[in-house]
Amino acid sequence: MQVCLEAVHDAGRLTLGYFGTGVGVDYKGDDSPVTIADVKAEELIRSRLEAAFPDHGIVGEEHGVSREGATHRWYIDPIDGTKSFIRGVPLYAVLLGLEVEGEVVLGAAYFPALDEMVHAAKGHGTHLNGRRCMVRDTTDLARAMVGFTDAASFERHGRGAAWRRVMDATYHRPGWSDAYGHALVATGRLEAMLDPILNAHDAAPFGIILPEAGGYFGDFAGNPGIHAAEGMSVTAALLPDMLRLLEA
């Protein structure tokens, strides 16, 4: 775990050297933005992992897959929320998760501009800056705060009706940025977070951070995991209600 935490922390501090500086932006084939900070942060994390775990596979957003087929696979998102990063919004994150034979067993999400580190390891709980944290104990959906990434994306991915049901049934729907919303659920500051499109490198750390905090992370149908191309973080108490609202 120490290698993971140090790599994520140091990569995050590296990104702060570019944050708020008007760093140049390029665009990938899918029109998503990338900066030199994304590239250098991933290179730093990769170098640490390769030195410590030479037999492990690595899946990174910027540099692809190495040692495909390895039983141990690290997922790196060097800057989750690049669009926020390039505009000086402090809610971006550096994400890292380890999957062993299909199960995420440890993960970390570091928010450099906030200096918040959320991490978990299987059987050891979830921690925020070293303090144990748990999901909220809310049992009434009508009092729940539910975060989301982009409201329009629910329509684009055929989830518009489900999203409208969630809006009607819940107390408040703040549009928290990307990984930060999932971290807010794990640390007891939000009851649920919905993301209708999510890659494995975006999701990986939350596959262990949420369960170890007493919550759920998985798809909108109740299947835990990081490979569904969508993601929901929610407290265990409110999971049945959220699944009912999201039912197609």
Where would I find each of the regions flagged by the language model?
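DPxDG-like acidic metal-binding loop motif
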Residues: E68-H127, A144
